[in-house]
């Protein structure tokens, strides 16, 4: 029997008198086939260390611990720590850290792996309400995670992996794809969770690029430009950029020069630009002193 078997999950919750907290976005997966598929997608073996976020009662952790060198699981809910100590008692390669992943010094914890030089993968069922902040926090942490295989709301997975000229494409797609390749591996129906969420989930596989997707003069400025270009999706690039940089004649002249340098027309929409075009635009705007 597995932790994720529905009857076992119910028994664990009842034995510990656990009640779900909506503020933590808790939905526990009760399908062992999907858990195995997650581990297979992440290609976990004994030469890999794993960071897990939000282990819950340990359903995914159990599968990870069986396959990985070590698992470090970050759980914000104190009430789950004794439950995890119970459900994972047979594993000596799991460390549960009762902390908010957004507030810890990750490098310090990673140094505590028995073999910190092994590749580190992030495998997690992320809370819906905080998926994007967690992902960007990890991606921008400077820690060279080799791969992320994470479950999230299907809509968010679609946005992250979206390509130009699609409805889902936006600044989040660019922010992630600058650092990583992103592809939806498979869909997880809402019916396999306790309690069932209102929407379906997706497993997103992201692999770190050896170098960022494009070369830019100023990364921070590049991301500011991409965000500004999608503030009003139905507006043209020109309208979004003048809203962000200003509408004085001097600014307009600089914007016109930058668009010409980047080989872009003013009435194009942000969703039509790929990372290469945004890199050209960002560098051109920078060269105009904007």
Swiss-Prot record:
Q: Which cysteines are joined by disulfide bonds?
A: none
The record's annotation in SMART domains points to: rADc
Q: Where in the cell is it found?
A: Cytoplasm
Q: Can you state which reaction this protein catalyses?
A: adenosine(1518)/adenosine(1519) in 16S rRNA + 4 S-adenosyl-L-methionine = N(6)-dimethyladenosine(1518)/N(6)-dimethyladenosine(1519) in 16S rRNA + 4 S-adenosyl-L-homocysteine + 4 H(+)
User: What family is it from?
Assistant: Belongs to the class I-like SAM-binding methyltransferase superfamily. rRNA adenine N(6)-methyltransferase family. RsmA subfamily.
**NCBIfam families attached to this UniProt entry:** ksgA
In its UniProt entry, what is this protein called? Ribosomal RNA small subunit methyltransferase A
């Amino acid at each position: 029997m597995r932790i994720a078997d529905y009857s076992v999950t119910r028994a664990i919750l009842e034995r510990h008198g656990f009640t779900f907290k909506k503020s933590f976005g808790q939905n526990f997966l009760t399908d062992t086939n999907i858990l195995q598929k997650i581990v297979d997608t992440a290609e976990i073996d004994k030469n890999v260390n794993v960071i897990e976020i939000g282990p819950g009662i340990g359903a995914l952790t159990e599968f990870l611990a069986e396959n990985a060198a070590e698992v470090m699981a970050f759980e914000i809910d104190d009430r789950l720590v004794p439950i995890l100590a119970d459900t994972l008692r047979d594993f000596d390669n799991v460390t549960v850290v009762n902390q908010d992943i957004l507030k810890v010094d990750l490098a310090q914890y990673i140094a505590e792996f028995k073999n910190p030089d092994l590749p580190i993968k992030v495998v997690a069922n992320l809370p819906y309400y905080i998926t994007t902040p967690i992902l960007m926090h990890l991606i921008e942490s400077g820690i060279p995670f080799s791969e992320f295989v994470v479950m999230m709301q299907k809509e968010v997975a679609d946005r992250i992996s979206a390509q130009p000229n699609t409805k889902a494409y936006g600044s989040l797609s660019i922010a992630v794809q600058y650092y990583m390749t992103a592809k939806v591996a498979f869909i997880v129906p809402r019916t396999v969770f306790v309690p069932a969420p209102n929407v379906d989930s997706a497993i997103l596989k992201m692999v770190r690029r050896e170098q960022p997707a494009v070369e830019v003069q100023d990364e921070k400025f590049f991301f500011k430009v991409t965000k500004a270009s999608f503030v009003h999706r139905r507006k043209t690039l020109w309208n979004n950029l003048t809203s962000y940089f200003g509408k004085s004649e001097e600014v307009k002249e600089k914007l016109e020069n930058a668009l010409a340098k980047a080989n872009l027309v003013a009435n194009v929409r942000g969703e039509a630009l790929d990372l290469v075009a945004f890199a050209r635009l960002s560098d051109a705007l920078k060269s105009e002193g904007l």
